[in-house]
Amino acid sequence: YPYFSGFREERGEGEGLGFNRNFPLGERVDGRMYRNVLRRALDVVRAFNPVFLVLALGLDPAKGDPTGTWTLSARDFLANGRMVAELDLPTVVVQEGGYRTRSLGSNARHFFQGLSAPFGGS
C-alpha cells in the first residue's frame, strides 16, 4: 500500500464523489489483518450492489516481495480469493503487482483457486 496516496478521507471527485473507498493499512500486515480489512471492503461492495466486479489484484503483499513489508502467504491468497468469490459476481481480474518471481505464480494460482472454489476449484 503506498503511503503517499489512498488515504481514508479520499472519497472520489466530481461525479465519482463518494464512490471511492480506501482502507489504509500499516507497514506490517499479515494475512489475518489483511482479511479483516478485506471483509470490511467487501461489505462496502455488497452494499453498493454492483452487477459485476473489476478487481485489481496486487500480489505484492506477499512475504518477501521486494516492494513491501507485508507477509501474506499462498494460503492467504487462497482465502482472499474465496472471500471475493462469496460476492457471487461476474468478475474480471487485472493482475497489477507482485515482484517476487519465486512466489508470484504460486500466489496467483492460489488466489484463482479460491476465486473459482464455487465452480469446483479448491
What are these regions (language model features)?
Residues 1-122:
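A general "terminal functional-core" signal
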